[in-house]
């Protein structure tokens, strides 16, 4: 259904309803270029009225984490009567197309924030404008962005709250909504996080139409669905539009999104949610990664690299001297370390059960009497826990040869205390040959710390060999 509405909204051609419409506290909106009548936006239309969109600001704080307080910019008394705290950072969470501000994913982000910080968390509900056909929803976000900007302006003018303390987090169309708000506030907003910004009607458009680095003092972006809308039905932008752009898993296919329709529907509550999750799984991963990053800051390190292909070939490791940024909630800790805009970072994640990953480079030197065909695996044992086995190499196993591979481990094992080695023979060998690891070096990605382990033993296939620090 979501797929149908998106594509229908792009292809329908409508007649112009006028050149401009104005609203008292929001200003005027035109249907002239670049807002409409372009190659990317063939539909000539104006945004719906503020009354029909009915943008609502749902305030959650550490004092009311479960029940929102409705605040309005046109009635500042509602803000003063609420738990809004002028001494805290304010984070807006803005949904996208055919979504609403009371969905669990928005409130879950707020609740996770409350576990790590004192914050004003405002979920922006604009379902009155998001449930339109896509081309109309694209226009409606201009009004929603204006409403967000107006609220921030009221906070500043009447309560002395600084826009630099505002962070806007927007998914899909919500990312461009945040951009509209930031543009109206002259880029004085502290931060905008774009969660897979919507591609249709925004890719390759002028900066004033879409998210770009000038919309806030710091703009970070997570790309999870960058395949083109035609023919791949990718909903997210491939274009780099932030100071820092993260491409987890290369930005196209997210682990766990390959499920068949039955298993996807079983995993969620309700048939409609199941269909939506299937059609937009990659697109939705962006806000799931962000939410997970709040409680797992070190599990989403982004490595600077020219391409995902180079990253996958064990390049771009470890982090450079200035370190690696953390994708998601803590990306702004790297602000100022990465000069310029459109800096590109790559990382891998897990599937729907466990997203964070910790990257290590493992080098194994073999010992034995003869060359064999098979595979070698290792497991890490650290102060914080033990990893499962990870394959390092498969093919011709030669004594004294060194095999190196980067692995993405599903937990932070901490300081590594020992390593276990396992090999398997792909052929039939009645002589029961032995093979071992004479040395294994493990390097962590974040700090480049190296751990060296040695052994003089060899073992038969499928028998664990334990290596201790050299």
Swiss-Prot record:
Q: Cellular location of this protein?
A: Secreted; Zymogen granule membrane; Cell projection, Neuron projection
Single annotated GO MF: phospholipase activity
Cellular component annotations (GO), alphabetically ordered: extracellular space; neuron projection; zymogen granule membrane
InterPro entries reported in the protein's UniProt record: AB_hydrolase_fold, Lipase, Lipase_LIPH, Lipase_N, Lipase_panc, PLAT/LH2_dom, PLAT/LH2_dom_sf, TAG_lipase
Q: Which cysteines are joined by disulfide bonds?
A: 22-28, 110-121, 257-281, 305-316, 319-324, 454-470
Question: Quick check: keyword Chaperone in the entry?
Answer: no
Tissue expression remark:
Pancreas.
User: Which positions fall inside the PLAT domain?
Assistant: 358-470
Top-level EC class? hydrolase
The annotated region (Required for galactolipase activity) lies at 94-106, 258-280
Q: What is its EC number?
A: 3.1.1.26, 3.1.1.3
List the carbohydrate attachment sites: 354, 429
**Catalytic center residues:** 172, 196, 283
Q: Key word Metal-binding present in the record?
A: yes
Enzymatic reactions: a triacylglycerol + H2O = a diacylglycerol + a fatty acid + H(+); a 1,2-diacyl-3-O-(beta-D-galactosyl)-sn-glycerol + 2 H2O = 3-beta-D-galactosyl-sn-glycerol + 2 a fatty acid + 2 H(+); 1,2,3-tri-(9Z-octadecenoyl)-glycerol + H2O = di-(9Z)-octadecenoylglycerol + (9Z)-octadecenoate + H(+); di-(9Z)-octadecenoylglycerol + H2O = (9Z-octadecenoyl)-glycerol + (9Z)-octadecenoate + H(+)
Signal peptide range in chain numbering: 1-18
Gene Ontology annotations of biological process type: galactolipid catabolic process; phosphatidylcholine catabolic process; phospholipid catabolic process; phospholipid metabolic process; triglyceride catabolic process
Mind listing the UniProt keywords for this protein, alphabetically?
Calcium, Cell projection, Cytoplasmic vesicle, Disulfide bond, Glycoprotein, Hydrolase, Lipid degradation, Lipid metabolism, Membrane, Metal-binding, Secreted, Signal
Cite the annotated pathway. Glycerolipid metabolism; triacylglycerol degradation; Glycolipid metabolism
**Record text on activity regulation:** Triacylglycerol lipase activity is inhibited by increasing bile salts concentrations and not reactivated by CLPS.
What task does this protein carry out?
A: Lipase that primarily hydrolyzes triglycerides and galactosylglycerides. In neonates, may play a major role in pancreatic digestion of dietary fats such as milk fat globules enriched in long-chain triglycerides. Hydrolyzes short-, medium- and long-chain fatty acyls in triglycerides without apparent positional specificity. Can completely deacylate triacylglycerols. When the liver matures and bile salt synthesis increases, likely functions mainly as a galactolipase and monoacylglycerol lipase.
The identity of this protein, by name, is Pancreatic lipase-related protein 2
């Amino acid at each position: 259904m979501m797929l149908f509405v998106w594509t229908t909204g792009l292809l329908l051609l409508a007649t112009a309803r006028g050149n401009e419409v104005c609203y008292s506290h929001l200003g005027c909106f035109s249907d002239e270029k670049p807002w409409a009548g372009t190659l990317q936006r063939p539909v000539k239309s104006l945004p719906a009225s503020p009354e029909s969109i009915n943008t609502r600001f749902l305030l959650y704080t550490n004092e009311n984490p479960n029940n929102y307080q409705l605040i309005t910019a046109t009635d500042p008394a509602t803000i003063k009567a609420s738990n809004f705290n002028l001494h805290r950072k304010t984070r807006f969470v803005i949904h996208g197309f055919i979504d609403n501000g009371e969905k669990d994913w928005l409130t879950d982000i707020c609740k996770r924030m409350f576990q790590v910080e004192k914050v004003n968390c405002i979920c922006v509900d604009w379902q009155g404008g998001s449930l339109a056909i896509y081309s109309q929803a694209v226009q409606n976000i201009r009004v929603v962005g204006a409403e967000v900007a107006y609220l921030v302006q009221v906070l500043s003018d009447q309560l002395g709250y600084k826009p630099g303390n505002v962070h806007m987090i927007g998914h899909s169309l919500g990312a461009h909504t945040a951009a509209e708000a930031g543009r109206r506030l002259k880029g004085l907003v502290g931060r905008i996080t774009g969660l897979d910004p919507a591609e249709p009607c925004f890719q390759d458009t002028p900066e004033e139409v879409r998210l770009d680095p000038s919309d806030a003092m710091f703009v970070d972006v997570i790309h999870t669905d960058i395949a083109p809308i035609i023919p791949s039905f990718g909903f997210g932008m491939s274009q780099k539009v932030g100071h820092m752009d993260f491409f987890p898993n290369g930005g196209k296919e997210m682990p766990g999104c390959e499920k068949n329709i039955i298993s996807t529907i079983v995993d969620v509550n309700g048939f409609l949610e199941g269909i939506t999750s299937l059609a937009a799984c990659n697109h939705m991963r962006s806000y799931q990664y962000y939410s997970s990053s709040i409680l797992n800051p070190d599990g989403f390190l982004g490595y600077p690299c020219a391409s995902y292909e180079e990253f996958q070939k064990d390049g771009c490791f470890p982090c450079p001297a200035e370190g690696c940024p953390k994708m998601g909630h803590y990306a702004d800790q790297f602000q100022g370390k990465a000069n310029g805009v459109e800096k590109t970072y790559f990382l891998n994640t897990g599937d729907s059960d466990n997203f964070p990953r910790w990257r290590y480079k493992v080098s194994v030197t073999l010992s034995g009497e003869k060359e064999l065909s098979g595979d070698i695996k290792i497991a890490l044992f650290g102060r914080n826990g033990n990893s499962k086995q990870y394959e390092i190499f498969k093919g011709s196993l030669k004594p004294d040869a060194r095999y190196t591979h980067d692995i993405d481990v599903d937990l932070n094992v901490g300081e590594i205390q020992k390593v276990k080695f396992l090999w398997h023979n792909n052929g039939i060998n009645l002589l029961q040959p032995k093979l071992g690891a004479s040395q294994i070096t493990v390097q962590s990605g974040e700090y480049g710390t190296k751990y060296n382990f040695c052994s003089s033993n060899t073992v038969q296939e499928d028998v664990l060999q334990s290596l201790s620090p050299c």
